[in-house]
Every structure is written in C-alpha cells, then in structure tokens.
C-alpha cells in the first residue's frame, strides 16, 4: 500500500534490510501443499464417540472424501479448510490416511492455528475449525482466499530504531531508503456534517505530561463486522478482529504507530479533563480489573472521575459497545517515561502503552486522526463533526545539522564524494542544502531516533552505503609514553589525598530523579532532562554530586552501616553544554571508630578540617575563606560557603533536618580553578 516492492525477491530484500541495520530474524511464508477449500455435504455423529463427527467433504474432486472431525462447530453446508493426505503442517505434522476409532479418515478439517496462523478471528472458534464465507470456491487454495498468502518478516528492531520502525509506514520509509523508492502515504478525505464538536465537548489539560491532545467527534456509527482486508491484516499482525470500530483504531495504530482511543460519547459526557492521578484514585479498566493509581500516573477524566488510564488502557465506564452510536476519538501524546512507569507498575503492557512509551511524532498524530475519520466514514457510516479540539504544547523545534563531506568521511574512514552523499540523503528522505562544501540537513520529525549531530548522519549514510563495503584500515596513532594528563591527572591527585584522609571513594550515576535534582541546586543551573530515559529515577542529569551521595547514604543506612565517610570526584553538566569537575563528600557517624577507648564523631569542624587540608594540598593556602549560611538545603546555623579569592567555589555544612533528621555533613568544591603548575606528582 505504501511502497511498490512487487519486483523484489523477498528473500533477497530481507538480506538488504539486515545489512542496513535491522535484523530480519525470520522470513515466514504460508504456502502448504495439498491444502484446499472444502464443503461439508453431510455430517453425522461417530458411532463410537460422544464428540467426534463423520463428515463427507467435497474438495473439488470427482468424489467426496470422508473425514472424521472433532470440532464442535462442524456441520453440513459449512465451507472449511481441508488438509489432504501428503500435506505437512507446522511442527512437521504430516497428514495421512488412517482410522479414528474404527472409521476411515482421509484428511483433516483445520483451524487457522493448526496451519501456523494464530487464531484471532473470533473467540467463538477458539476450540473449533475455521468457518469460511459462502463465496469460498471449493478446491481452491484457502490461504490465498483468506488473503494470508503474503510473506511476513519477523524483525529484531534495535532500541534506537523503535520510534520509527515500529509501525508499517515507518518501516516502509526504511525499505524506501534501501531501494531508493518513494513512499506513498494514504490520501484520506471525508465529508463533515454541519455541526461543530465545540457544541458538544470541552477539553482541559492540567498536566505537563500531556503536551499534545487532539479529539474529533463522530456520530451515528453502525457497529458491524470489519471488511475482510482489515480483518486479515489484523490477524497477520497478531490481533483479533472484534468489530469495525475497534478494528479501525487498531489498524490505524499499526499504520502510523499512533494509538487512538474511542470513548462512547454518551457515557463520557461533554467534558474531558486530563490531569495527574490522585494518590489512591481507582479506575476499572477495559479488562475488568480495578487499578489503584498514584500521582505519577496520568488519567483522562470526565471532569471528575477517571475514565481512562492515559496511554495504557481505557476505562470500563466509557467503553464502546454494540449500542454505541456516537464516539469521541482521542489522538494524543503523553510523556513516555510516565507511561512506561505506569504500565510497569500496573503490570499492564498494552499495544498502546508500548508505543506511547517509545515517544510519538505529533505530525503522525494528526494524520492518524484524519485516517481514522476516513475509515469510520467508509466502513462504519460515521458522520464526522467539524473542527478539532486541541491542546498543543508540544516542542516543534526542527532539528538541523551542518557538516562537510570530510566530516562524514573522517567518521566512516572511507571516501564518499558529495554527489553520492546527496543521493544517500535523498534516499533517506532528508531535506538538505549544499553550499560552500557544507551540508545543512533537516531531520524528518518521524526520525525521533536521530539527534542533530554529525555522528548520527554519518551512521545513516554509512548503513545505506553498506557497512559490508567499508574497507578496514589501521588507525594512525602516534606512540608516546603513557601518563595521565590534564584534568584526569588533577582529579586523581585530589582523590588520592582524600583517601589518605580516611574517606572512601564512591562512583555513582550521573543521572538522578527529578525530586533529587531539586536538592542542592545552589548554583541554579538549568538541568538536562532526558527525553527517553530508562526510568524516572534516572531522568535528570545532575548539576551537583551531593544528591547522588545522599542516595548512597540511604542505601548504606538501610543495611545498618553506621559510619559513612564518602567522597566522589566527577563531572556535572547543565543545559548550556557546560561540564564542570567537582569533588563532593558526605560524612556521618564516627570519623575515628572506637579504639584505645577513643572515638571521634563527625561534626562541622571535622569536615571543615578535611576541606582545609584539601584546599591547602590543591595549592590554595591563604587564598580561601568561609562565610556562614546562605545555602537552602543546609542547616542555617551549621553551614558555610567556600570562597576562593572572594569567589564562591563550594559549600559545606550539615544537611538540613527537613531533608535528613540524621546528623549528616556534606561538602562540594568546584575543581575548575586550579594552579597552572602542579607541585606534586600523581601516585
């Protein structure tokens, strides 16, 4: 539907796809010899069984054949799938003539799952044979009749391509790049009735975790069976067809990667409020289970009560059923981190939550909404109201990157001229300008996996050029005597000094939670927030090391460790692309443990003595001073700022009791200012 590959050998195309970076794990075809459409011309009970039937089946030959069948739904006049003797079904199961309880059987009447096709058509047939429509022609290939004779690729899509290759149109663009062919998107249109959604519906969004929410209203829909092509494609994608309305929402999701949710408008009412859930709030989801929510979750409400766990599963109280006539179509974007957290917490990984958790492209959100309206008008007789209700706070920044051909060649280690690069960029559907031997490339919004860095563009050009075509070359590296240099050497010297002062080195994550990132924000720097983090606990790049050490303290305290003396030398980062080397310490309990009837407890002056020794060692003797108070997260009477030549370089003091009731002391010093000539050697 989206790209012409009729001239391609599908096995060879699978190799090309794999070479481009997406591994084709398996090529699945459904051809089975000796498989035909049959018609049951008689069906009687087996004389020696309470559940078997003896059937005479017309398979398009001169005479009907006798088959013993145990399916509860087999009956006279039914069109069925018949495996004749010699057919080999999945699992290397060969059909042979034989006797079942003394009665001859010359084949097998089949269900789809027995042919290696997951049974998704109707729960009624979960334990029965497949019932074909009356227009099925006896003797013909049932796989072809069902439209299931296509070839399937089972893909191993790497995480960094999950955003753009997890839906059919996105994967069509990938094949288009490989074959240098144009992708054709569906051209959707529909008529609108003379009535606006604004007359029936209001939208309010109160959470920042929903940057984009759109909705349209359709009315007078007719719930019925979906057209065959939609049912067949859903089955091949592993989904069970239900009815035309539900099937259309799933079909569009597979096309554009955009989950849609259909609310029964009459059950919903005239308002939608999107907000963070309240602690302990409850909702019964479509699977009939009660879910207990927290403030980390997002809910769609009717203004008061929840009607949907946003991005995860709809609510039972607004479910579309056979009596539904008017629906509200939701197409939205939710914070992927929040959705992944909620889905994991509720143990509810739906097709929608998987896609929301990967991040979405708002342009395809709009296209998916339009596509759904087109299909609902065509296959559900829907009347579409005018206007779209929209909440739009999504970041629409266009990502561009500038580079020269030499930049690409240096990264790939080969020579590709600029004309070939233009071809590769065109294949990728990347718009570009080329001037003064410089490319300026605009990255399509659908490619959420690509950041505006030349490295990402080089990777794209390289994989289309073919990594198998890259020539191996030895790197040119000058040989020199090994030694630590610059900042690394300096940090190692400082670290060694602190170990001699009795502290233990910690190595912590650079990423912390949003709540921890609010602590010790004394420099008030804008933080880097990851758009697609592993978890909420690791979603913000720290601007201070102290929150990380507090996490280590909490971990050790829970394991009954009383004396905790820690330091870390590491870098911090902010949104202005600044990185800063810092040293931080955390001390609690005894500085000197019991021995010879003597113990020294950690207090402010112990920590101040350590800091003074360190500053002297760093070459700052007689240049530093302390000024009391002024740090929000430290005890106002037991804290100070550290100054170097009257310039603030750090803090010291007891952690404020509002954060920790325990007596815990911390310090943090910037290592940006240091003597140009080091007077000690690194050990």
Model regions: which residues?
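Long, charge-dense accessory insertions within large macromolecular proteins
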Residues: 3-9, 17, 21-27, 39, ...
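Short, conserved phosphate-binding/catalytic loop or strand-edge motifs used
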Residues: 148-153, 192, 212, 249, ...
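Extended beta-strand-rich architecture
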Residues: 226, 351, 360, 367, ...
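Conserved phosphate/anionic-ligand binding catalytic regions in large, soluble enzymes, centered on
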Residues: 1, 71-79, 160-178, 238-262, ...
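Conserved mixed alpha/beta core segments that line enzyme active sites in large multi-domain catalysts
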Residues: 37-68, 243, 249-317
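Glycine/proline-enriched, intrinsically flexible loops and inter-domain linkers
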Residues: 2, 30, 53, 179, ...
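Mobile "lid/hinge" segments at catalytic clefts and subdomain interfaces of large enzymes
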Residues: 101-128, 142-151, 176, 298-396, ...
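Phosphate-backbone binding interfaces of nucleic-acid-interacting proteins
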Residues: 1-195, 328, 345-351, 355, ...
């Amino acid at each position: 539907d989206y790209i012409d590959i009729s001239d391609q050998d599908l096995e060879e195309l699978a190799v090309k796809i794999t070479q481009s970076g997406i591994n084709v794990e398996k090529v699945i075809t459904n051809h089975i010899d000796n498989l035909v459409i049959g018609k049951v011309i008689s069906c009687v009970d087996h004389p020696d069984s309470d559940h078997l039937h003896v059937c005479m089946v017309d398979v398009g030959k001169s005479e009907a054949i006798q088959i013993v069948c145990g399916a509860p739904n087999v009956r006279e006049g039914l069109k069925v799938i018949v495996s004749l003797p010699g057919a080999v079904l999945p699992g290397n199961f060969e059909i042979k003539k034989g006797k079942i309880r003394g009665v001859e059987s010359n084949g097998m009447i089949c269900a789809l799952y027995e042919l290696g096709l997951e049974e998704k058509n109707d729960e009624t047939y979960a334990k029965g044979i497949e019932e074909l429509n009356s227009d099925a022609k006896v003797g013909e290939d049932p796989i072809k009749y069902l439209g299931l004779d296509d070839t399937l690729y089972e893909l191993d899509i790497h995480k960094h391509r999950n955003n753009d290759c997890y839906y059919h149109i996105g994967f069509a663009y990938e094949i288009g790049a490989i074959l240098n062919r144009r992708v054709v998107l569906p051209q959707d249109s529909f008529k609108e009735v003379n009535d606006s959604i604004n007359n029936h519906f209001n939208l309010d969004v109160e959470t920042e975790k929903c940057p984009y929410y759109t909705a349209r209203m359709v009315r007078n829909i007719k719930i019925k069976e979906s057209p065959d092509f939609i049912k067949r494609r859903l089955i091949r994608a592993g989904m069970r067809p239900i009815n035309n309305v539900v099937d259309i929402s799933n079909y569009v999701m597979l096309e554009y990667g955009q989950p849609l949710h259909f609310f029964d408008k009459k059950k919903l009412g005239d308002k939608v409020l999107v907000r963070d859930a309240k602690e302990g709030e409850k909702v019964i989801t479509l699977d009939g289970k009660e879910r207990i929510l927290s403030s980390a979750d997002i809910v769609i409400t009717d203004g008061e009560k929840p009607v949907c766990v946003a991005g995860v599963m709809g609510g039972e109280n607004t479910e579309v059923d056979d009596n539904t006539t008017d629906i509200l179509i939701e197409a939205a974007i939710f914070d992927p981190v929040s959705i992944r957290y909620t889905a994991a917490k509720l143990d509810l990984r739906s097709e929608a939550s998987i896609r929301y958790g990967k991040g979405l492209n708002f342009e395809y959100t709009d296209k998916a909404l339009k596509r759904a309206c087109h299909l609902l008008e065509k296959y559900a007789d829907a009347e579409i109201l005018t206007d779209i209700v929209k909440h739009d706070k999504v970041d629409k920044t266009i990502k561009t990157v500038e580079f020269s051909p030499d930049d690409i060649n240096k990264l790939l280690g080969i020579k590709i001229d600029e004309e070939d690069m233009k071809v590769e960029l065109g294949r990728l559907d990347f718009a570009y300008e080329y001037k003064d031997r410089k490319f300026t490339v605009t990255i399509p919004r659908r490619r959420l996996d690509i950041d505006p860095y030349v490295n990402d563009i080089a990777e794209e050009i390289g994989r289309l050029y073919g990594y198998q075509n890259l020539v191996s070359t030895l790197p040119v590296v000058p040989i020199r005597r090994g030694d630590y240099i610059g900042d690394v050497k300096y940090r190692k010297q400082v670290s060694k000094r602190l170990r001699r002062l009795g502290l233990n080195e910690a190595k912590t994550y650079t990423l912390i939670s949003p709540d921890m990132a609010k602590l010790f924000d004394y420099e008030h720097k804008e933080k880097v927030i990851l758009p697609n983090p592993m978890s909420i606990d690791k979603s913000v790049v720290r601007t201070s090391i102290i929150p990380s050490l507090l996490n280590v303290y909490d971990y050790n305290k829970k394991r009954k460790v009383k004396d905790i003396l820690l330091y870390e030398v590491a870098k911090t980062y902010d949104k202005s692309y600044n990185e800063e080397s810092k040293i931080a310490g955390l001390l609690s309990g005894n500085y000197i443990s019991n021995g010879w009837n003597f113990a020294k407890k950690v207090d402010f002056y112990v920590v101040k003595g350590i800091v003074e020794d360190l500053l002297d060692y760093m070459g700052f003797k007689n240049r530093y001073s302390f000024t009391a108070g002024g740090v929000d997260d430290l005890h106002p009477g037991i804290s100070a700022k550290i100054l170097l030549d009257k310039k603030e370089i750090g803090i010291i003091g007891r952690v404020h009791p509002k954060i920790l009731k325990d007596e815990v002391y911390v310090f943090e010093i910037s290592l940006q200012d240091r003597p140009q000539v080091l007077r000690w050697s690194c050990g």
